[in-house]
Regions:
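Class I SAM-dependent methyltransferase SAM/SAH-binding core
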Residues: 40, 46-96, 121-122
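Class I SAM-dependent methyltransferase Rossmann-like catalytic core
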Residues: 1-22
Length: 268
């Protein structure tokens, strides 16, 4: 089964994915990692977080899986460039993991479940299956109900509503973060620990880059959704883009995407 991304695939968004690092997106799980662990990263994307995890558990093996061939190829190239040898990448489906039961000491996912929506529980159960007894699963997903826009205006609020409808139409659930404790518990995990962090665009360069990502969506897949669903015309689209250009250049602008983080254990 092909798993859709929570956003349209644009060059700007792909570049943004490569900026993600274990030191931030996986900070909540780093204290639990030990050298020699066998770790799986489900929905690894371009692998930049995976490589950071591999550094923490070396010489233990780390496997990154993703349904996107381009992501896997990108991850492999970065691993070679950084000379990280205890990591491997492969294409795989999050619902039918190609591993035996009790294979891994730890499993990690960052913003995978937003893509899977109500099937996230199926993936969580597969993750439970491949974990060793006593192993843990660390899940981190966004919750768009808690998005913070610095220098927000009414147009940005309107964009948020449209963006939510678009994701919903694609089968994505961008408010799934708050449901992670329930998902992990129903999949069989115990003793869950919950924390919250945010992916923030706060410096002028990252703010302008984030505005550019949104503009590229408005010129691509989101444009079609708006027009097809009579949510706006070409004038409205132009107005949105002009607002994001101005927002991206304003000194008070920032963006924070709040994420819920949950670690759960498989009983020994």
């Amino acid at each position: 089964m092909e798993q859709k991304r929570a956003h349209g695939v644009t060059p700007g968004l792909n570049k943004d994915y490569t900026r993600r690092k274990a030191e931030h997106q996986a900070a909540f799980v780093l204290p639990y990692l030990k050298p020699g662990m066998n770790l799986l990263d489900v929905g690894c994307g371009p692998g930049t977080i995976t490589l950071g995890l591999a550094d923490r558990v070396k010489p233990g093996p780390v496997t990154g899986i993703d349904h996107d061939k381009i992501n896997i190829e990108s991850a492999e190239k970065i691993a070679v460039k950084k000379n990280i040898t205890n990591v491997s990448f492969r294409m795989a489906d999050a619902f039918t993991l190609p591993f035996k039961e009790n294979s891994f000491d730890a499993v990690f996912e960052n913003n995978l479940f937003v893509h899977l929506s109500d099937r996230a529980i199926d993936s969580a159960r597969e993750i439970f299956r491949v974990l060793k007894n006593g192993g843990f699963f660390a899940a981190r997903d966004a919750d768009a109900d808690s998005v913070v826009w610095g220098n927000q205006n009414e147009t940005l609020k309107e964009f948020d509503k449209i963006f939510y409808l678009w994701q919903q139409s694609r089968g994505s659930e961008i408010t799934i973060g708050k449901k992670l404790p329930v998902i992990l518990r129903e999949a069989g995990f115990i003793n869950t620990i919950k924390t919250v962090s945010a992916d923030t665009k706060g410096d002028p360069e990252s703010v302008k880059s984030h505005a550019g990502i949104i503009i590229s969506l408005l010129e691509g897949p989101l444009k079609k959704f708006i027009v097809d669903n009579n949510l706006g015309d070409s004038f409205f689209l132009g107005y949105l883009k002009e607002n994001f250009i101005s927002w991206g250049e304003h000194p008070d602008s920032f963006f924070a995407n709040v994420h819920v983080e949950v670690i759960g254990w498989k009983q020994t």
